[in-house]
Each structure stands twice: as structure tokens, then as C-alpha cells.
Design a protein with these regions (language model features):
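Charged, gly/pro-rich active-site loop segments
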Residues: 1-7, 64, 80, 86-125
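Short beta-strand segments
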Residues: 20-65, 81-85
Length: 125
């Protein structure tokens, strides 16, 4: 019997941890794709890691609940997340792709507090 593989290879996890920006791909209820650049942090848990991203207090033209990525996740929680490095020397190009279910975390919950703490640690303001 073979051992189960981790959801993300340790080398890929290190690559993700070293970067500051990723791209989150979602799809709406009809399957139309949308991709946005995001800031993110990882939270380690006993079964693996969780990628968290803020729906922050920057001025927006809509309430955060009406953001396309939020509506898409509510309709179809399966997402893709990619972190990459571009180099003029194409032999040095690198990227890691993670796929899985996303969920929205409501403010004033322990999970929200944990996410905010992880994001503040990675992106001190």
C-alpha cells in the first residue's frame, strides 16, 4: 500500500510561502471564468494548510458580498489558485497550481480572526 500524497508537495508549499501575490480563479454559475490577483497567507492545520485572502476595507464600488469572486464562490466553490515567477530566461519560469473548494468566512468568527492575524503577519502595514 502506498502512503497518501499531501495535498501540496513540501517544495511547492515553500514556493507558495516565499511569494507575495497569487491569482485566484473562480467561475460563475454558468461556468464563465474570472481571475483576480490576490494577497494571501497560509494557515497550517493538522490536515494541511489553508490559503486565506482578505476582502479588505479598501474603497470599493460595491459591498464585499457583491464582489464577483464572492458571488462566484457562493455559486461554485471549486477554485484554482496559482503562484508564479516570471523570468526572461524561460528555463527559470516556475509556478504552482492548487485546486480545491473555497469558503467564505464571516467577520467576528474565530476563523476570521485567525485569517486576519496571518495576513497581518505576512503583510505588515
Amino acid at each position: 500500500m502506498t502512503e497518501p500524497k499531501p495535498a501540496v508537495d513540501p517544495a511547492d508549499l515553500a514556493f507558495i510561502l516565499e511569494r507575495r501575490i497569487g491569482h485566484l480563479a473562480t467561475a460563475d454559475e454558468d461556468g464563465a471564468p474570472s481571475v483576480v490577483p490576490i494577497c494571501y497567507a497560509l494557515i497550517d492545520h493538522d490536515g494541511g494548510s489553508t490559503i486565506v485572502t482578505p476582502l479588505d476595507a479598501k474603497p470599493k464600488t460595491v459591498d464585499w458580498r457583491d464582489l464577483r469572486r464572492v458571488r462566484n464562490i457562493a455559486a461554485r466553490p471549486e477554485v484554482s489558485f496559482v503562484v508564479d515567477d516570471y523570468a526572461e530566461d524561460w528555463s527559470r519560469l516556475a509556478w504552482v497550481l492548487v485546486r480545491g473548494p473555497a469558503r467564505l468566512v464571516e467577520p467576528a468568527t474565530p476563523a476570521h480572526s485567525e485569517a486576519v492575524e496571518a495576513l497581518r503577519e505576512k503583510y505588515p502595514q
